[in-house]
Amino acid sequence: MGDPAAHEMADLERGFSSEDDAEYRSGDDEASKFVENEPSKRGKISQKKKIEQTNFAKWMDTNQKSLTRKAVKQSVNQDNSLAYMIRSWEGGEKIITSPRDYQMELFERAKQQNTIAVLDTGSGKTLIAALLLDHTVNQELEDRAKGLPRRIAFFLVEKVALAFQQHAVLECNLAHSVAVFSGESIKNTWTKGFWETQLADHEVIVCTAEILNQCLQYAYIRIDQINLLVFDEAHHTKKNHPYARIIKDYYASGKDRGLRLPRIFGMTASPVDALIDVRQAAIELEGLLHSRIATTADPDALRRAVGRPKKEIIYKYNPLVKPIQTMLTFKLRPLIANNKQFSKAFAFSEAAARELGTWFVDRMWQLFLEDEELLKLEAKTERSLSKDMAAPEVVEKHRNAVRSARELIRSHEFPKPEPGLLSSKLKTLSKLLEEYFTDSSIRCIVFVERRWTAKLLTDFFESHAAEIPGLKVGSLMGANAEGGSSQTSFREQIRTILSFKKGNTNCIFATSVAEEGLDIPDCNLIIRFDICKTMIQYIQSRGRARQADSTYIHLIEGGNGDHRRIMHQNAENEKLLRRFCNTQPEDRLLKGSDYDMDFFLRQERNQRQYTIKSTGARLTYKNSLPILQAFLNTLRNQDDYAEGMDLVADYSILSVQGGFICEVMMPPLSPVTSAIGKVYSTKQVAKCSAAFELCFQLIQKKFLDDHLRSKFVEKRHVMANARLAVSSKNKAKYDMRLKPQIWAELGVPEKLYATVLILSKPSALERPSRPLFILTRTPLPQLKPFLLFLGPVEQEMTSDLVCQVLNCPITPTEEDLQLLTKFTLKIFVDIFNKKYAANAQALPYFFAPTNKDHVFLFSNLQDPRNAVDWPLLRHVADRDAEAYTGDEPEEFFQDKYIVDPHDGARRFWLQGIRKDLTCTSPVPADVEHQPTHRQWKRREVPHDILHWSLTAWKATREAHENKWKENQPVVVGKYATLRRNFLADINETSKNPFCYFVLEPMRISPLPVDVVAMAYLLPSIIHRIEQNLIALDACRLLQLDIHPDLALEALTKDSDNQGEDERMDSIQAFEPVNFQPGMGANYERLELLGDSFLKMATTIAVFTLIPNKDEFDYHCERMVMICNQNLFGVAKSDDLKLHEYIRSKSFERGTWYPVLKLEFGKTHLKTLKQMDEHRLADKSIADVCEALIGAAYMTTRKHDDYDLAVRAVTRLVNHKQHPMTKWDDYHAAYVMPGWQTMPANAAELDMAQKIHEATGYQFKHPRVLRSAFRHPSRPYVFDKVPHYQRLEFLGDALFDMACVDYLFHIAPDEGPQWLTEHKMAMVSNQFLGCLAVSLGFHKFILHHHASIGSQIHEYVTEITEARRAAEDAAEAAGKPRSAYSRDYWVEAPQPPKCIPDVLEAYVGAIFVDSKYDYSVVQQFFHAHVLPFFASMRMYDTFANKHPVTFFTQYVFETFGCHAYGLHAEEMPVKDDTGLVTGKTQVVAGILLHGQVVEGAVRDSGRYAKIAAARKALDKLRSMTRQEFLDAYKCDCKPGEAAEDISESATAI
């Protein structure tokens, strides 16, 4: 049927001509130029983008199969894999399958007895030593608590460099004080008091063995004050070596005297380091160290686990020639040969001439006798001779000889390195390097015997690197007390190793320092330039090549029998070592938990079984291990899997009362993280029991099907793969509310509540004005002042509009209501040409004039009635217009408001009389506003002032044709603006406002001009008030008392693509589409804040209500609540219909009027019909939910009251896992677990105290802190607390909230993109790792994984070096070192994940320990995080490291190309792809000149774009400029910009 009123209007429009409906106009037709809501037009697609879209679509179609295929597929199907594993399980004796297996066994053995670990290089002996040290110190703390004397542990090394190396590793991995000493560092502090202080201050001391030997010798330390002795490279224990002296002189004698002796733990790759019998050496080593050897039954098997070279090659070089003395050496010999400082140099010159070539001898002298070095040698010569009591003339003679040598060097002409001056050995090395360094991935170590050889080879290849492209050399030598330019410090060694790790150096020339001890990143090429003299050298240097495709090369001299003998002897000795290991007694073998599994399973009767009734499939102890391994293999099919991830189960077996117990720990991708088996008498059965328990959990949780095969591909958590995202492209039409509920409360008002409308800057209005009252039946909320644009902004013609709500109501009489009604209706008719048929019962609000000015303090009013201008109300009520005869005095014609009763668009401000004009005078030429009726346009009437003043209908004009007073004065007026929207800065079309007319056809309004001036602002004011009230209606539905301005901000969407941009993933900056000004702040900032609070609130809820699930389940439970799909569904529900309250359209001149019966004036039914619906994306509706949560948070934040935000979360997620209605409900629901309340042991108390000293927070429950630092690799049975992942999950959300809240408040004018980019810096793993290290958290991480320890050490070294460099830079700039730039971490590498993880877990731990007191999180944030972010400007470019942004920079800077594009589309689903899981897959592609470079598929556009950009970067990095130009036909010119660069990215 349609709307009857609409039909009526259509009839009226057909009945009138355009000239006859002028009186119904309200200026809206002529004001069309001020309308901001122009329909958005589809942007023109450029030719470039069309090509890109076409090519991208073709590429997607071509590559769809490969895109949807999993990154890694199993080579065999699951059935075959399982069958194969079972067959392999049943046959043959099992050996150690995992390094963790033997490490834990060795650790347990070392706790019980003195042990020498004989294991290959790289097998994790240092990890075991660290575990043993941690265990020993923890036990020591318990002993002290019982009153036993204090003892300390010593970690002994053979070389000074190793002391600093091992100290760095232990300091990073132990939560106790670790000191390091070398003879040089303490030579001036060697006193009893000094050592007493060290024993009191530290728990572990790392030093060279001689230091401890002397301490024991001088009785500074007694043997019974030591609880653990660790001997690194224990094979040195022989004869009078300090290792042997410590044992013989102090340990053995202490044993005879019954002293409390330390545990001994020795580490070595071989019990021998010389050409002696292995068995005899082993017996002697065990005897000397009072220990038993622990080794593996099959060393080869262990090497397969820890890595060893794939290829071992012997290269022969031609026989070396007899050394020839060079001319320079000949000349130097008589000068300095007798000087002891040069004896080693002359000896090396002979070896260098033969081994390297004569060119190197002269180069050695050139480097050795540099000016700086010679000055040192001269001084040393003088000191040496002085000690020998040499005569002064002898000293002077030697000094002059050194100076003569320096002059000789300066004048010598050094030859170029011609082939004839180089040895065959050097040429062979050069050829090898040239051959291998065609591959950019090569990392090479060249082992040499002498320090000077390393120095000279580095110098040679550094100077001639251009001859071998890609070769970047460095040297690594031990610290040497002697002078000379080859001296290196430990810090320089670390820098070299870091450079090697980063790839800045890819070839190191190293002495034996790189063989033993120093932790060098795995390389893939080892070259023995000088042959291994002993088997242990061979084993240790070979252990440096651990990558799967590595190569080990021996250089031997052709025809050299000694070389062949040494090679043969080393090989035979290794065979003997293997045979020795195989023949060790049972108590010395590490066999692991798989050894002879079948035998032990047959012996054990008490085994559990589980049968699945539907299929008869049976889970047993025997098949649980292969079933579990098959399940692990299927984890490769998951999206989170990355190449190189370790998909193995770690079994930790401990000795307990009654036998052994095993805990199996799964990799992070597994939905079940761990299980503990039952106690059995053998390790083998205990291990099977743990595997059985974990498989049983997988069956119960439906991850194994009825045939015991993995269902992980299809099912994880019940909602893990659910379609939880909503599209920003999926839009629909929805109703939109135009009027608030408060206006529907009609009837005769008993009380009226006054809100006064005040201009903060009334001078911004071009004429005087006075405040107005708006009177309502219900009090209006106190709104925040909002800006009105009253004129040009550049002229500062803006003012805030203050809505001052008065508390005391008015009780109106019937007369009062009549006066107010007439005044209100008069404003509508005279100013806005709307005559309504309404009484006081029908009006939603009333206007009233005040008798005060804008500066009056209305808040002091006791009774608002006293501020109402009642005389004016009566004046307006008594007349429709002011009387006019034409004979009034001249002052009458000032400051009047003139209404044209026949044309609603014509209103004038009366300015005075124009005495030189009459009503018959022609309209002056400067009048720009002309009548619009047809007769005027057709010049059917005279263009004089009288007819300009007449706009009545034709019949009316003709009826009065000769009745107008000809002598009435012509007045001057200013055309009143048609503008209604003062909420936006709109540039009005400038026309001359002055006009000349007569008053007889017009009406003089009884409204004073100062009232009218203010009333002109009512459309904007009423619109904004209504928007606030509608927003509050939404909050009322949600039962949330949100501040009105925050409520409106949360519901405001001011552009078509608001909330739809992938801010951090688009190549270009975000630009709003169809932006609508004047709406105030939009929801995006509050959405970001609300998103963080929503994440935090739901995280706390699931952590509290589901204590027995793991992090994976937590993520799924939280995801279901916070996902856009859930928020969208709740918002659209019938009891909310939140979409109706979203404000998506700016001011429109027809919608502010009250809904009343219109008697006269233009209706807006058509406009209202357009405005009562809007198109919204699903995501926009979900975003508004988050923004409302942010608004609720902000409403009460200043009082530290989060109850309102908690209620908002509960209402908007509508989920059983978040029933809380106030903050205290979280902790009220928390049930403290038993492990938390157990008494803390001494180690836990010690840890809590140290953390308190570092952070300032004192734990009430130290075991919660312990949990925060327990890595998943550490078995549960060690600490009896959960690992840190649950607390990390909690802390991540808490920390994120603290960061967003901080940024939100320090940058009130910054948009969501700025907030997001700077939050990225604060929550990045890079920063969290840096912060954790600065607090010393890395030392407390409790892990049982060798690679984690080394990763921590590497990262701590790098971040410490970065900080030191920042301090150096501050000092160089003349600042204190403490004034270093706090962004030093930005360029540091990514930390091992466990470091930022424990920091987040710590945040979660303090929250739990403090009974859910969020203020402790804020205190931690302010105390420890903010110092790094005192200035956010230094992080403005942090987001530029984003892969997409970095790609564009790289392409432009490297190749000068700017014709790039980024496209993303949802992947078309074909066949069954994506249907099982219901996932939405998005494919993104990076394009250059319309050609797809690389693409990737992920679950969201964000991650697809990141992955595509990274792949594209990897591809382009290997290309030369010419290859790039050829491949992509690039013709970009420098300095030129792409024409349509803003369209280079799609929004998915």
Swiss-Prot record:
Binding positions for ATP per the UniProt entry: 119-126
Domain PAZ per the UniProt entry, residue ranges: 871-1006
GO BP term (any one): siRNA processing
Residues of the site described as Important for activity: 1393
Residue span(s) of domain Helicase C-terminal: 428-589
Cofactor annotation: Mg(2+); Mn(2+)
Biased composition annotated in UniProt, kind: Basic and acidic residues: 1-41
A GO MF label: ATP binding
Boundaries of every DRBM domain copy: 1445-1518
Residues that bind Zn(2+): 1457, 1489, 1530, 1532
UniProt keyword terms in alphabetical order: Antiviral defense, Antiviral protein, ATP-binding, Helicase, Hydrolase, Magnesium, Manganese, Metal-binding, Nucleotide-binding, Repeat, RNA-binding, Zinc
GO cellular component: cytoplasm; nucleus
Family matches, as PROSITE patterns: DICER_DSRBF, HELICASE_ATP_BIND_1, HELICASE_CTER, PAZ, RNASE_3_1, RNASE_3_2
Sequence positions that bind Mg(2+): 1288, 1397, 1400
Domain RNase III: 1051-1197, 1248-1411
Short motif DEAH box, span: 232-235
Domain (Helicase ATP-binding): residue spans on this chain: 106-289
Disulphide bond pairs: none
UniProt function note: Dicer-like endonuclease involved in cleaving double-stranded RNA in the RNA interference (RNAi) pathway. Produces 21 to 25 bp dsRNAs (siRNAs) which target the selective destruction of homologous RNAs leading to sequence-specific suppression of gene expression, called post-transcriptional gene silencing (PTGS). Part of a broad host defense response against viral infection and transposons.
Family as reported in the entry's similarity comment: Belongs to the helicase family. Dicer subfamily.
This protein's name: Dicer-like protein 1
Gene that produces this protein: DCL-1
